[in-house]
Every structure is written in C-alpha cells, then in structure tokens.
Amino acid sequence: MPSFQPIEAPKCPRCGKSVYAAEERLAGGYVFHKNCFKCGMCNKSLDSTNCTEHERELYCKTCHGRKFGPKGYGFGTGAGTLSMDNGSQFLRENGDVPSVRNGARLEPRAIARAPEGEGCPRCGGYVYAAEQMLARGRSWHKECFKCGTCKKGLDSILCCEAPDKNIYCKGCYAKKFGPKGYGYGQGGGALQSDCYAHDDGAPQIRAAIDVDKIQARPGEGCPRCGGVVYAAEQKLSKGREWHKKCFNCKDCHKTLDSINASDGPDRDVYCRTCYGKKWGPHGYGFACGSGFLQTDGLTEDQISANRPFYNPDTTSIKARDGEGCPRCGGAVFAAEQQLSKGKVWHKKCYNCADCHRPLDSVLACDGPDGDIHCRACYGKLFGPKGFGYGHAPTLVSTSGESTIQFPDGRPLAGPKTSGGCPRCGFAVFAAEQMISKTRIWHKRCFYCSDCRKSLDSTNLNDGPDGDIYCRACYGRNFGPKGVGYGLGAGALTTF
C-alpha cells in the first residue's frame, strides 16, 4: 500500500511555522501569517498598501524610511528639519552601536554587490524598491543620486543626464557641457572663462560657422548669403528658406522669429518697427503708434511713389440694360457688389445720392425715386413734414403743399371685395392687415370710430354695431349709465 506524503506548507519568516492558504499574507515573495503581518519596529498592523519587505522582515513605510532611508538635514521625520537620529534605537543584538559621521548621519552600511550593469551606477550595489531613484533607465540609491561634481542632492526636476553616463545638477551640467562664451555662464550676462580639463589641457575653442561656405544653386539657397540651408538650421519666411543666423532684420539686425518677422516688398525680412518706418503709412499718428509727425527723410514724391493711388473706373465695362449698377451703369463683379432692394451696386457707388455719405446695410434707405439715401436725407426728402418731425422739434416751412399721398389715410384705388376692410371696403393684404373679432382691417383704418384714436390689441373694443372703439368711447356708448359709471367713478352721466 503506497504511503501518503502531505504537501509541505511554506514557513512564515516571522515565527517559522507553517502558513496555510486561509491565513496567508504575501509580501516580497514571502508568505506570512495574518497575525505576523505587522511592522517589526512599531508592531503596527500592515496591509498591501503600507507594507515594505526588507531582508525577510516587514516594516511600515515610516519605520523603513527611518531605518534604511537617508539621514541628514531635510530627511528626518519631515522635510525641513534637522534629524539628530543616530540610529541608537536600532542596536544590534550584541550591543554594538554603528559609528556616526558628523553626529547625525550613519556610516554607509555594507551593501551586497550586484551583477555588472544591474546595480547602482555609482556604487554598484543592489538597489531595493524603497530607496531607488530612476535616471537614464537605471536604478540609483537615494544616497548616490546626487550631482557628480558638487554632490548636491538631486530629484527628477533638478537631474540632468550627461553624455558621460553620469548625473549632474543644472548648474554643473551647463558649465561642463553647455555652450561657452559671453552671455552663457551662470544665467547670461556674465563672461565665463572657466577652463575645464581636456586632453590637451586647454579649453575648447568653437570656430564660427561660415554658412555661405557651401553655395547653393541660384534661387535655392538662403536669400541673404546664398548658402545651402539644411533642415537643422532652416527658418521659413514667405516660402523661402533662411539660415537661422541670417534670419534677422535687414536694417537693425535684430534676431527675428515667426511672430515679429515682416516680409518686405523687396523680398527681404524686417522687424515690425523697421517695416513700419520703411513701408508703413507716414504722417501724423502713424509712427510706431506715437502721435507725432514722422518724416524719416522721405519726401512727398518718394512716399507717393512707394504708395501709388488707384481710382478704378467702374463705367469702363458697361452692362446690359437693367443689369448693371443703378448709379453708373457699369458691370458689377462679385468682389465689389452691394445689394439693395434687389439691385446690385458697386461698393464705390453705394453712397447717399444727396450727401454722398458711404452706406451699408444698416444705414441705407431705398427711396421711391429708385435711388438710395442715408437716413437723414431720406427723412428730409420723403418723411412727414410739420411740427415735431425732422431732426428737431421745429416747424418746417415748405411751399405749403402736403407731402402726404393719402390725407385721409385710406386707399383711393383697388378692387372692393365683400371680405375686404369693413371701413373702406378695399382688399386687405397680409403686410397691412389688423385682425379684430374675425374681421380684417387695414392698419390705417384700424382706429376708434368716434375719436379716431389709433388702436392696437391692448386697447381694442369690438362694439355691438360691428365697429371698433377705444375703451373710453366704448364705455361711453355701450357701458352702464348712472352714478359712478361715467368717465370716472362718482360722476353722473346724462347720456
């Protein structure tokens, strides 16, 4: 009969007893009992979010940082405090106390050497998750993650990865690998003459780049020097390629970019100021935004020659009868057309027929004479006359002839229909109709039958006789009579 061998359960690193599946907790590849899964220093219960395993021992993040993290100014308990923790609470079992450097920082502990190319690039030891810092895809100890020159502590913001596979702070990186010369050392504006050790013991001298040394074919190179422009140094302007060194103002030699570059008529580039002085408008109020007279040594003949004036003749191309501009009769093209009352006008001709003020779709008024006018001229020519009309409440003295075509406010011609206006009998069109008790009226006929007051939907009253009245006349004709019912309360009407 075969013997039965039970599967051996894994052992807990804390107590050394077997751990079964119902009570196991995992950390760092080891299995712990649920009761043993707590910090080895402060005995705090742990979970998967706050536990840290180090050499088969469990710690909370705080205790792990205090025991294995860096020591010194800014690292103890919280940033910005001086930690005097010398590790005395971490005495070994034999009572040995680790030596202390400068009274605060622990001596480097013995670190196991990692295989070549896998450990910390500075010390070569294993890097655990609690203390690793990443740079150039490699893991560093937090203690080793400092500038290779000034030994300043670094982080992900201050770290600069150098071509020599080391890390530096920004200042040391700029001094060692950045550009040299006036304006580059220590933030610009200072002459830097630092000499760094080279193979020959002398500083490197950077030769000036001669961009026109390699000439391009005519019409293909840089417009300023004629040299070939490569992709690493090209600047584009108006479809042409420039060297970055040559892309400056032709007059003041100010360095340009895509924002302040202006293409001149001479196919060169200028800054905005020089472009405005040379090609912009001249006169009072135009000089770079200042309110003074700018001459800049230019005569009126030179200014006129640079800015020729062209007055187009709109009558040179005649249109067919009834199709051209109503004012000049010339053909109107799409780029210059203005629309008014179904007619097409030239933009130049679209002005008031009397005062010649330029018009637009807001100011234009179509007159009965087939022409267009501004509002003021339209009111003077075709508007009502008399006291209170016109531009001011003044009495207008004219020839004495009335300008109103229909003095009684009623149409004089047209077909009379049975369903027309109840007052005049003529047909009522949609543009002028007013509705009252299922009957349609002209707008001019829509007034009180007694006092001739104009009516609307708010003061309209339909009388029993089929006519319309205002409220006062309706009450006077059809309302109750007696004390308190007249035009006002408490008045006796004798109708």
Swiss-Prot record:
UniProt GO BP: muscle organ development; muscle tissue development; sarcomere organization
UniProt domain LIM zinc-binding: residue ranges: 12-63, 120-172, 222-274, 325-377, 421-473
UniProt xrefs under PROSITE patterns: LIM_DOMAIN_1 (PS00478), LIM_DOMAIN_2 (PS50023)
GO molecular function, one term: metal ion binding
SMART domains for this protein: LIM (SM00132)
A single GO cellular-component term on record: nucleus
Subcellular location: Cytoplasm; Nucleus
Alphabetic keyword roster: Cytoplasm, Developmental protein, Differentiation, LIM domain, Metal-binding, Myogenesis, Nucleus, Repeat, Zinc
Expression sites by tissue: In the embryo, expression is restricted to the somatic, visceral, and pharyngeal muscles. Within the somatic musculature, expression is localized at the ends of muscles fibers at the point of attachment to the epidermis (at protein level). There is no expression in cardiac mesoderm or in fat body.
Residue spans crossing the bilayer: none
Matches recorded under Pfam families: LIM
InterPro entries with a match to the protein in the record: Znf_LIM
Motif (Nuclear localization signal): 66-71, 175-180
Keyword Zinc: yes
General function of this protein: Plays a role in cell differentiation late in myogenesis. Transcription factor Mef2 is essential for expression.
PANTHER family named in the record: MUSCLE LIM PROTEIN MLP84B, RHO-GTPASE-ACTIVATING PROTEIN LRG1
Name of this chain's protein: Muscle LIM protein Mlp84B
Species of origin: Drosophila melanogaster
Organism placement in taxonomy: Eukaryota, Metazoa, Ecdysozoa, Arthropoda, Hexapoda
